[in-house]
Amino acid sequence: MNTYAIWVNLAPGAKDLELVAAVNAYLGALQHEGTVESWSVQRRQFGFGPSELGEFMIQIRTQNLTQLEAAFTHAARRSGEMERLHVEVYSRVQDFRSGLYRDFPDAVRVS
């Protein structure tokens, strides 16, 4: 399993519950397309965490990098309903940071 981790802060004037609803709508559409397995949205608690990373962490899980690339391809088209859903997310955030992780050790690890 691969995890695309995203850290963001709310953009000025954005509301936290609206961001979560937008993320759920967008990633739900990607899941319906078969390009995302699951996701979670988490919020920093009590201010604990590195200041470089945002208050919100979004973890998007895919079976493999091929599936993740398909999700990126949907976003890259920048048209239609998928773009409308994407705008609903990124218009509410700032200070975007991301990372890519995988389960470890993975199935191909020999030693």
Regions found by a protein language model. Give the residues of each.
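Short, flexible turn/loop "capping" segments at secondary-structure junctions
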Residues: 1-2, 49-52
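Active-site-flanking beta-strand signature of metal-NTP-handling nucleotidyl enzymes
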Residues: 2-10
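Hydrophobic pocket/interface hotspot
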Residues: 6, 19, 58, 68
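Structural beta->alpha junctions
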Residues: 10-14, 62-64
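Short amphipathic alpha-helical segments
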Residues: 14-41
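An amphipathic, aromatic/His-enriched active-site/gating alpha helix that lines ligand/cofactor pockets
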Residues: 29-37, 51-53, 59-100
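Short, solvent-exposed loop/turn elements at beta->coil junctions and helix N-caps
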Residues: 42-47
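Short, low-order "capping/linker" segments at domain edges
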Residues: 97-111
